[in-house]
């Protein structure tokens, strides 16, 4: 005998839709028994939840900051690269830094923005 052959009970049906009552409190079905005032108020009140923390956007300087920007203290990257040990090149949305180590090896770092 297989369990799947046994008749399954009919699914439970209900005429009580609490979410609809929250949306449309005046359209409660008349067939429900009257509840006391406190229970009705609890059903109509939305559940108390803490709001998630709001993210604040952090303003970041754009990649195209000019060398004359007075907010950058000291020499800029391009000014430092004039010493010949490393260079910075930009192309579209990428920035490439090429540097020479004291041992003579060349290191290249490319950032795709």
UniProtKB/Swiss-Prot annotation:
What are its GO cellular component terms? host cell cytoplasm; host cell nucleus
Q: How is it modified after translation?
A: Phosphorylated by host ERK. The phosphorylation triggers a structural change that enhances keratin binding and protein stability.
Q: Which domain of life is it from?
A: Viruses
Residues of the region (Disordered) are 24-89
Q: Which GO terms describe its biological process?
A: symbiont-mediated arrest of host cell cycle during G2/M transition
Just give the chief location class.
Answer: host cell
Keywords of the record? Early protein, Host cytoplasm, Host G2/M cell cycle arrest by virus, Host nucleus, Host-virus interaction, Modulation of host cell cycle by virus, Phosphoprotein
Q: Mark out the compositionally biased spans (Basic residues).
A: 46-60
Localisation per UniProt entry: Host cytoplasm; Host nucleus
**Where do Low complexity bias regions lie?**
24-38, 61-75
Other observations noted: The major E4 form is first synthesized as an E1^E4 fusion protein from spliced E1^E4 transcripts, such that the first few amino acids of the E4 protein are derived from the N terminus of E1.
Subunit info here reads: Assembles into oligomeric complexes. Interacts with host CDK1. Interacts with host SRPK1; this interaction may favor expression of late viral transcripts. Interacts with host cytokeratin components KRT8 and KRT18.
Family membership, please give it.
Belongs to the papillomaviridae E4 protein family.
Q: What does this protein do?
A: Contributes to multiple aspects of the viral life cycle including viral genome amplification, suppression of suprabasal cell differentiation and egress of newly formed virions. Induces host cell cycle arrest at the G2 phase by associating with and preventing the nuclear entry of host CDK1/cyclin B1 complexes. Inhibits cellular DNA replication by preventing loading of host replication licensing proteins MCM2 and MCM7 onto chromatin. Within the cytoplasm, associates with host kinase SRPK1, a splicing factor regulator, and inhibits its activity.
The name on file for this protein is Protein E4
